[in-house]
Structures are given as structure tokens and as C-alpha cells.
């Protein structure tokens, strides 16, 4: 089975870059990057020093429900190319020692017992293991330090 690391959809990102409200109904904040620790969730690259970026609330779920976590993310303020879907861990994530992987069912709710902090070099193996289960529709990869949404992982 192949897996796919998936960045935020371009259609959603473009409306946010055009000034549409975020998941909390607020206009995204616009800042200038110092080049350190500003990962865009669309191109899956760091926003370079001097480039503008957006800070906004993102809810990576199709509808409101108790498990629909919302949290802060960064996006380039100007259009960027969406990261190609791939079965290879995007380079952006490789320097970080670990991430949270968590499985969700087709009802977009957490599948209990699936969430864990996983060493980065084991992400692909753990994703294969979790997505091999019939009760898991997709995974979220999140920061192990701040729980920030990084990307979605699906069967490929």
C-alpha cells in the first residue's frame, strides 16, 4: 500500500491568501518572516526571511463536531505552488525529531489508541501500519511540541 502526504488544498489556500476569514471568522494576520520556523502548510517549505506570511486558525475537518480541532498555522501570503503529493516524507519535516500521528475514522473523529509521538524516521512505517486498519480513513501529522497541524496522510 502506498501512502500520500497531502498539503492543504490550493482552492482553500487561495481564498485565505485573498483575505477570506479563517476558521474563527477572523482575517488572517499578515507578518514578515525572519526566516526561522515559519512552515507554509501549502508548499510545505519554510517562508524565507523577508517574505510575507499569514497566521490563521485552521480546522482541517469538513464540519464542526467535538473532535474538529482548530489551531494556528502559517501560509505564504502570496501564491505558492502546492507541495506534490508523495509517499516520501517532505523535506520540511525531516529536521524535527518527532511528530504526533493520529488516526481518524470516516466520521472525522479520532480513532482512540492511534495517537502517539512518533520519531521522524519512523513516520512512514507507522503511517503504513495505521492506514492498514479498516477503521482508519486518514491521519493527521501534528507537532509533538505544540500540536500544530502539519499535513494529512492518506492511502495512496
Regions found by a protein language model. Name each.
Residues 18-98, 102-116:
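Conserved mixed alpha/beta catalytic, RNA-binding, or beta-rich assembly cores of soluble enzyme
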Residues 143-148:
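Short Gly/Ser/Thr- and Asp/Glu-enriched loop/turn motifs at secondary-structure junctions
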Residues 149-156:
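C-terminal edge-of-domain segments
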Residues 1-17:
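Extended boundary segments
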Residues 102-138, 142, 155:
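Short, hydrophobic/π-rich interface segment
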Amino acid at each position: 500500500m502506498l501512502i500520500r502526504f497531502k498539503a492543504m488544498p490550493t482552492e482553500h489556500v487561495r481564498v485565505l491568501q485573498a483575505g477570506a476569514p479563517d476558521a474563527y471568522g477572523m482575517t488572517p494576520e499578515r507578518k514578515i518572516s525572519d526566516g526561522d520556523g515559519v512552515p507554509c502548510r501549502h508548499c510545505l517549505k519554510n517562508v524565507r526571511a523577508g517574505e510575507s506570511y499569514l497566521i490563521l486558525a485552521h480546522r482541517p475537518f469538513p464540519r464542526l463536531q467535538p473532535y474538529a480541532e482548530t489551531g494556528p498555522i502559517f501560509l505564504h501570503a502570496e501564491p505558492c505552488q502546492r507541495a506534490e503529493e508523495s509517499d516520501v516524507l517532505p523535506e520540511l519535516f525531516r529536521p524535527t525529531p518527532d511528530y504526533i500521528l493520529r488516526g481518524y475514522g470516516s466520521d472525522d473523529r479520532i480513532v482512540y489508541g492511534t495517537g502517539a509521538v512518533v520519531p521522524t524516521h519512523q513516520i512512514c512505517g507507522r503511517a503504513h501500519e495505521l492506514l492498514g486498519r479498516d477503521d482508519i480513513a486518514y491521519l493527521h501529522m501534528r507537532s509533538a511540541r505544540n500540536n500544530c497541524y502539519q499535513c494529512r496522510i492518506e492511502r495512496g
